[in-house]
Amino acid sequence: MEEFDSEDFSTSEEDEDYVPSGGEYSEDDINELVKEDEVDGEEETQKTKGTKRKAESVLARKRKQGGLSLEEDEEDANEESGGSSSEEEDAATEQQKGVESEDARKKKEDELWASFLNDVGPKSKVPPSTHVKTGEETEETSSSHLVKAERLEKPKETEKVKITKVFDFAGEEVRVIKEVDATSKEAKSFFKQNEKEKPQSNVPPAVPSLPAGSGLKRSSGMSSLLGKIGAKKQKMSTLEKSKLDWESFKEEEGIGEELAIHNRGKEGYIERKAFLDRVDHRQFEIERDLRLSKMKP
């Protein structure tokens, strides 16, 4: 047994160390090696084909994605165009509906007006001439009202009359020309005086003239003339003469408005005095009213 075991061990070692040469291969071994090479080549070709297929599939997927994106863009554009076209159609339909509603409303108004005219009858039909006349009448009335309003607004401008008065100042004759209203008392008295002083020569004599020998008539005529000549003129005081000179100077120089504006200011003595007088008078009236109210039971 021990020998057998040693032999077996030796044979096993020999088997491990033994390497067959190429000439010692059998046909079956060669066929198996060829098949293994072919299998390895097929696996490599399959691997390369798999990688190619993977690349092609990736490209195809990318193309498909690009196509999908393009298709999506086209669909969005189509949707937008469809939406705009639908909006235009809606606007057109709304416009058409509005026109139809306006037409229907006008038609309804015409029908109502026709029915109203039928109910009223021929009395409502008035000839156009009457309308024109009424329009003219209204225009005339409106114009007359406007004229009346203007007359009321505009105060009546009174006519001015120049009168001349003769005064005696220190033996000199002074003529004063004043411009007053025609309806004033001063103007009326001046006109009456002029009518009285008119010579009676313009008036035709009602009684035949007496002979020249009558001394009474001649004496009366001479006395009237002497009376007119020797009539006393109205005397003028120094204050009146200075006032007259000042007024004439203002008119010649044209400083009346400037003086009036100056007197209305703070430096105007006359205006200030008048204002203070008005204040005193108003204060007196208030005190009087208070006293009277206290005196009443």
UniProtKB/Swiss-Prot annotation:
GO terms for biological process: chromatin remodeling. The modification Phosphoserine is found at residues 81, 84-85, 115, 214, 248. Residues 97-111, 147-157, 190-199 have a biased composition (Basic and acidic residues). The modification N6-methyllysine is found at residue 217. There is a cross-link at residue 148 (Glycyl lysine isopeptide (Lys-Gly) (interchain with G-Cter in SUMO2)). Keywords: Developmental protein, Isopeptide bond, Methylation, Phosphoprotein, Ubl conjugation. Residues 1-157, 190-222 are annotated as: Disordered. Residues 176-215 are annotated as: Hydrophilic. Brain. GO terms for cellular component: Swr1 complex. The keyword Phosphoprotein applies. Residues 1-18, 25-43, 70-79 have a biased composition (Acidic residues). Residues 216-297 form the BCNT-C domain. The keyword Plastid does not apply. Gene duplication of the ancestral BCNT gene leads to the h-type BCNT (CFDP1) gene and the p97BCNT (CFDP2) gene. The latter contains a region derived from the endonuclease domain of a retrotransposable element RTE-1. This repetitive sequence associated with the BCNT gene is specific to Ruminantia. May play a role during embryogenesis. This is Craniofacial development protein 1.
